Amino acid sequence: MSQDSATTTPPPPLTSDVSMPSGEEDEPKHVTSEEEAPVTSETNLKLPLMPELEESNHTAEVVSEKVTPETMTLESEGLNHAAEDSEQTHEVTPETETAKLEVLNHTAEDSEQTHEVTPEKETVKSEFLNHVAEDSEQTHEVTPETETVKSEVLNHAAEDSEQPRGVTPTPETETSEADTSLLVTSETEEPNHAAEDYSETEPSQKLMLEQRRKYMEVEDWTEPELPDEAVLEAAASVPEPKQPEPQTPPPPPSTTTSTVASRSLAEMMNREEAEVEEKQKIQIPRSLGSFKEETNKISDLSETELNALQELRHLLQVSQDSSKTSIWGVPLLKDDRTDVVLLKFLRARDFKPQEAYSMLNKTLQWRIDFNIEELLDENLGDDLDKVVFMQGQDKENHPVCYNVYGEFQNKDLYQKTFSDEEKRERFLRWRIQFLEKSIRNLDFVAGGVSTICQVNDLKNSPGPGKTELRLATKQALHLLQDNYPEFVSKQIFINVPWWYLAFYRIISPFMSQRSKSKLVFAGPSRSAETLLKYISPEHVPVQYGGLSVDNCECNSDFTHDDIATEITVKPTTKQTVEIIVYEKCTIVWEIRVVGWEVSYGAEFVPENKEGYTVIIQKPRKMTAKNELVVSHSFKVGEVGRILLTVDNPTSTKKMLIYRFKVKPLACE
């Protein structure tokens, strides 16, 4: 078993550099590498594009049909022999000067063809194949050896010839030859299966579509609104998209080298695309894109954004009583913080000044109707203090708000909060009051902190059957979206159950990329790890894997200012932390391993070799049910080292978090 060690010298604690973590599939395109020959004839033929071939698991093979005339006439026996070989009757009608467009329009609906016409002489002869078998595609290549075409060339695709003849079963085709050299690749039109699918949509799927429409304009706030029970059942019952059954086409002739290569490439592309699509189905990203919060500095605004801000200022100046109006403690005019507030409304309306002004006016009127100023001083009790609370800040200094919906598993609390309309209204007022007080702690300074990080704990949260809770959260969500724009820096969902992920899959296609980039999801096994990516351990509550004890009845010698150190303990290894002591003092420390299931021990080793090692904590197995954070203190009477040892016997890595403090001894 390998052993790692970390040496720590007080008084400055060890610090660790923590870095911030940061639809329809495109159809395969057929690319033709042949160069387009220059136009040498006065005749300009416009070839109509044929409808696109229906998509299937195997790519339709595209074969070029090339007819190269050498003389004015072809021997009839050659054509007759060719017709016998393919069991088809082909009529070859020579024309002069121009090709008849009617023949080109007589193309099968489900075919994809490349027509190439190559002139050889000033006088052009057109040949048309008027009758082709319905389920076959014939490639006829005529290679002149002498002034007359030999029948053997049409009968057999010469193996040593540069232009072999191959027969590939695809839809019917027709070719024409004119004075002009043209290469036209037409793609068939894909049938519109979406219309058929919608017409046959089951009621459960219609419920999901209706739920999606509700989220067409998901804004900054994305609190965990509980979906309808019928919607969740629909999400769970929707089967995976059926893949078209593979169809095995008849093997192409071995002599058609270009067709075989094209088919192999197409099959490889289909296989790779299918693998990518399958991965996208089963993967649920924990982070849905990177998002960099705007600084709200005027110098960072584009010219368009700056013009919009100036126009919104002008609209406020010409309006009545704007100079006497304030919001969240910030005057709307003649204040350094005003621009930060106005930019929130502008961003919520895509920098459209008139719409932002309308939204701001509606918000001001709602605040009057809701009696926000009186609400701040209203006593609504402390029953919900464990449901929603502020604690610490993230690594970008945003205050962190925790929403713990599992508290509503308490039946008494649930009934007391949601049993009737009056109690739900009181809950709504309490939620708005809490948010207003939190916003008043923001600085609204350009380049400062004017947003909040939201952590939503969905562990043991009531399911979709709790109608009263769903109605209350939906109403709160609408108020937050309409009247508190751009106040969330990031939404972190932890302990996410399966039903919420199913619900999110329904609404996510209708959310803007900017809104989705603020969302982070983590299941129960990764919740602590995810929080520690965005929030330092000294700010993460102990119940979520950190060291913060703001809302715990714990005796702690540490505050948020005491930086913690994170160390990854590799599987089946032992990690030792050294705290070197140079003087007589008292050392206090906190240590925890996220999830524990390790052995922990502590001892003091004096520098004097004749001294005795003091066992502070005998090695013992720590489980997840033990205390979340282990706190110790030791009075040191001589120079030496305190060794904290963590032995990880498991096959998974563990996160070790610790911090310590040196307290000088009182003068005796």
Curated annotation (Swiss-Prot):
Residues 170-186 have a biased composition (Polar residues). The keyword Membrane applies. It is found in: Membrane; Cytoplasm. It comes from the Eukaryota. One of its GO terms (molecular function) is lipid binding. CDD domains: SEC14. It is a peripheral membrane protein. Residues 556-662 form the GOLD domain. Belongs to the patellin family. 'Patella' means 'small plate' in Latin. This is Patellin-5.
